[in-house]
Amino acid sequence: MEWLQKNEDIDFLCQNRYNINQLKLFGYSMRLREVKMRGKRSIISLIIVCLIGCMLCGCDKKQDTEKEIGKNAPKIVVGSDNYPPFNYIDENGKPTGIDVDIATEAFKRLGYRVEFVNIEWEDKKNLVENGDIDCIWGCFSIKGRENDYKWTKPYMVSRQVVAVNKSSNIYSLSDLEGKIIAVQSTTKPEEIFLNPTDSKIPEVKEVFSLEDREQIYTYLGKGYVDAISAHETAIRQYMQDYDMDYRILDESIFVTGIGAAFAINDDRGIEEKLSEKFDEMQKDGTMEIIVSKYLSNAYKYLEVDSLE
């Protein structure tokens, strides 16, 4: 009768005057039903396990297929120098930055895999024309160079600015007259200060053109120059990385779009396809997600439609 004591319905059955045979029969039926239900549950569980297994195998196969496609995809070689936050080497020795992320995603959507190579910025034009690299991609301003390369459309807006030490008595562009300024060679600031065409740019005493962009900060810190000029984003990144406190003048020397540049004789049309992907990445929010990883107020750097 041990089975009766375990039956939750025993009191109900006795109160309704069921005899012992009926109780046994009831218990047998309940157990039989329970066995059947357990059997059904086991079968359902087995089916679910099989389905999950198939799905996991499918995912693994899909991932393996994608990896295989990635290995076999045509390669694009992108050349840039070290220019945080656009292109630099992370603590794991891998290229990273705004341009690296945008280029990787855009080329992936076009079916290419990307290899990033560090170049001497002064050699960029020769390298792309000789085919040593496929394109130049490193916070590269378009304005004034339209006829030198085949360009993508701009994917970001960049301000070229002047920065000075906090204690400097330079507060405006006009205060730069007769001063010494440092710039990276073959950049837009070098062109602007060596051959000024805008009336707001004063005649400076001397322009130091340095190959390594980080040297401009050293020259400013040592007092060799009175000011430096570069992309605002690059200056702010340096200030953040090295805990420096420069003062950036309010007035910019140049506002431009930045893009990727291909050789003028490159007839593959990749720059046009990339431009389409830039539009796509703007619309689906990918551009803002990428830029937000490195810069605050990402939206203001993506207002490319505001460029003249």
What are the language-model segments listed below?
Residues 60, 100-109, 170, 174-188, ...:
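Extended ligand-binding regions for polar small-molecule ligands
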Residues 91, 103-112, 189-210, 239-243:
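Ligand-binding cleft/hinge of the Venus flytrap
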Residues 82-83, 91-94, 140-142, 165-169, ...:
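Short coil/turn segments
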Residues 104, 108, 113-175, 247, ...:
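Acidic, polar ligand-binding/catalytic clefts
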Residues 55-58:
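C-terminal motif of bacterial Sec signal peptides marking the signal peptidase cleavage site
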Residues 64-139, 209, 284:
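Extracytoplasmic small-molecule ligand-binding "clamshell" domains
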Residues 80-82, 157-164, 240-279, 297-308:
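Periplasmic-binding protein-like
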Residues 123-126, 139-148, 192-195, 219-255:
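A ligand-binding cleft/hinge motif common to bilobed small-molecule-binding domains
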